[in-house]
Amino acid sequence: MINKTKRLMVSRQVKIPRKTYFWGPTPNPGMHPKDQSVTLLSIIRDYLKLSDKEREAARILANGLVKVDGKTVREKKFAVGFMDVIEINGESYRVVYNDQGALVLMKETKERASMKLLKVRSKVIAPGNRIQLGTHDGRTFITDDKSKKVGDVWAVSVPDMKISEIIKMQPGNKAYITAGSHVNQTGTISKIEAKEGSSANLVHFQEGFSTIKDHVFMIGSSKFSFVLSPEEVIP
């Protein structure tokens, strides 16, 4: 089976030229879902324009010049997604969304690049009656702290992933929208509306819009704020 994707069929969340080549880059299975991730090959060649050819991009990676979340990565099909921090040639970038829901790069300072936000996506009981938590970027954490909830967002340091702040999904706290018609907007939660049955819970914002709970990514509280208003976005 050919592990390739036609460029015209690549997810619209990936901003690459559609007609330059026949085949498009296919991410390896990894931390982020295939349709919500971009390969490092695309980041180097199509986003940052640091190479013209795949071979040149592969050489940059092979030389250990690229880090993701503080760790060196050499695989050209390595998948990066929302909130990942990429360091290359002394510059740092964070993967965010634009107004069309496509993944883009936001330039970061070195200080801010040392931090990442993780959203808790799942919570299950692990062996030994411990708690296993899964985050939006595919990481797994084992803890005895039962107070941590799905929907919480953690501010962690990279690369050691130590939690410095926990932002709860609750009225008064600030959030970033990751999908839907309000993608790439920020707002302050006014109310969380629980729906009956299989309907998705709604989150209402002081700014006058609403979205489903799954699209809400917390970024601020009364004690902590993480600004996502990129002035320089690539491409």
From Swiss-Prot:
State any GO BP term from the record. translation
Give me the Gene Ontology terms describing cellular component. Answer: cytosolic small ribosomal subunit
Question: Per its record, what are the GO molecular function terms?
Answer: rRNA binding; structural constituent of ribosome
* Record-linked InterPro entries: Rib_uL2_dom2, Ribosomal_eS4, Ribosomal_eS4_central_region, Ribosomal_eS4_central_sf, Ribosomal_eS4_KOW, S4_RNA-bd, S4_RNA-bd_sf
**CDD domains recorded for this chain?**
KOW_RPS4 (cd06087), S4 (cd00165)
Keywords assigned: Ribonucleoprotein, Ribosomal protein, RNA-binding, rRNA-binding
Q: Which PROSITE patterns match?
A: S4 (PS50889)
Specify the S4 RNA-binding domain's residue ranges: 38-99
Which Gene3D superfamilies does this UniProt record tie to the protein? 2.30.30.30, 2.40.50.740, RNA-binding S4 domain
**Entry similarity comment:** Belongs to the eukaryotic ribosomal protein eS4 family.
Question: Which NCBIfam families does the entry mention?
Answer: PRK04313.1 (NF003312)
Protein name in the entry: Small ribosomal subunit protein eS4
Natural source organism? Thermoplasma acidophilum (strain ATCC 25905 / DSM 1728 / JCM 9062 / NBRC 15155 / AMRC-C165)
**UniProt gene name:** rps4e
